[in-house]
């Protein structure tokens, strides 16, 4: 180091054998040689103070110049950036028209649970947000063009930004959950989020591998993918209620059966409902190559020639990324021939009756007749030989 240079004493020095690095900051500032240092700093001391103490301005440095502006830009702590970009996809999804089924379900469950309005708001907020975030991911994974009759989120913001936004949204849900006074809140959210993602992974696996699951495997997938969100709602409500004498097991069973009913109903409506065609496109599940209960039944009950046709069309769908209109119409006619659509209606009827019996059981145990839940079930019921809606 030359005699004209200032020596900067540095504790805990890590010296490199190579020549020191010279930073030319312009003619107004002399060359400065620094050694690579690793130095602990008190947490209370600002980063700017640390920079100033380790790298003092040379005597030849003139304040107000271009170099000082550069130093302020690169060495100062900057304000936090706007979250507008990461929030926009989620806000768009949340703004899409919805029938509010989950809001109605939570409101109905509270007839039994008796959570406070504040607790109810916190549960509804988390459950609805998780639902919308899962829709964003579902549409990316299924390459769905429409969601609730509007362009899907990733078709507007792109896949990368949509995935990033949904991931950030999950982190935000976990942050809010961790700030609740009840420690069980976060545990429940994590537990059922995990169930949801594991269930979704099975759905994706079967589609990717073109592998037909058993009915039992299908139900296990649904219990995670769809039932997880319903159980999250009921468990959070009980955890937030100070006066509930509810048996959690009763509600767990009800929510799991409701999840199965919702998923099978959704699969059926996707193939038969004009309203669903307008909202998501004609038989969109066939574009996805989805192994719904109806598809599983058709594959297991068709003759050999039809099975070869179905398997071949599923292979072709994976190659092209979608099913053609003619393919969809052919698959639909084969499902009708095997009685698969009617089979789904019969299963829905069995589930509906079981759900209604559970509702009556909980009514008796709580001493409260739950009309909102009954009204919701009546609105969702699909009766045998129901016409195309």
From Swiss-Prot:
Biological function: Catalyzes the trans-addition of the 2 molecules of isopentenyl diphosphate (IPP) onto geranyl diphosphate (GDP) to form geranylgeranyl pyrophosphate (GGDP). Does not catalyze the conversion of dimethylallyl diphosphate (DMAPP).
Gene3D superfamilies cross-referenced by the UniProt entry: Farnesyl Diphosphate Synthase
GO biological process: alcohol biosynthetic process; farnesyl diphosphate biosynthetic process; geranylgeranyl diphosphate biosynthetic process; mycotoxin biosynthetic process
Stored InterPro entries: Isoprenoid_synthase_dom_sf, Polyprenyl_synt, Polyprenyl_synt_CS
Residues involved in isopentenyl diphosphate binding: 99, 102, 131, 148
UniProt GO MF annotations: (2E,6E)-farnesyl diphosphate synthase activity; geranylgeranyl diphosphate synthase activity; metal ion binding
Record organism: Phomopsis amygdali (Fusicoccum amygdali)
UniProt lineage: Eukaryota, Fungi, Dikarya, Ascomycota, Pezizomycotina
Compartments in which it is found: Cytoplasm
Similarity field: Belongs to the FPP/GGPP synthase family.
Secreted is among the record's keywords: no
Binding site residues for Mg(2+) 1: 138, 142
Keywords: Cytoplasm, Isoprene biosynthesis, Magnesium, Metal-binding, Transferase
Residue numbers binding Mg(2+) 2: 138, 142
GO cellular component terms, A-Z: cytoplasm
Keyword Metal-binding recorded: yes
Superkingdom: Eukaryota
Cofactor, free-text remark: Binds 2 Mg(2+) ions per subunit.
EC number(s) recorded for this UniProt protein: 2.5.1.29, 2.5.1.10
The protein, known as: Geranylgeranyl pyrophosphate synthase A
